[in-house]
Amino acid sequence: LWSVVVYDSPEADRMTVVDKHVAGLPAIIEDGTLVAGGQINDNSDPRKPIGSSLMIRADTKEDVVKILKNDTFGKYNIWDIDNAIIHNLFCVYREGQAYQL
């Protein structure tokens, strides 16, 4: 499992392709790739999107980058994938499930 924070490129306008992005989500949710995700908003203006936070199931960091690049936001350079913050995550708890010691 991977924790991802990917900010939008400085001049990006995600609203121009958000419908295409959302239309692609069911496939990666249903196959278990996207565990959780959502829009990150600017703290000073909660209506202004600045990126995305995701939990992605993949084997390697390189696989995560491929998933990001295949997303509409990746294809249209909305996300600044080169500067994405990607870390392997050992998930101890998520709603409905807890790690058993």
Q: Which residues are covered by each model-predicted region?
A:
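Conserved, structured core segments of small domains
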Residues: L1-L101
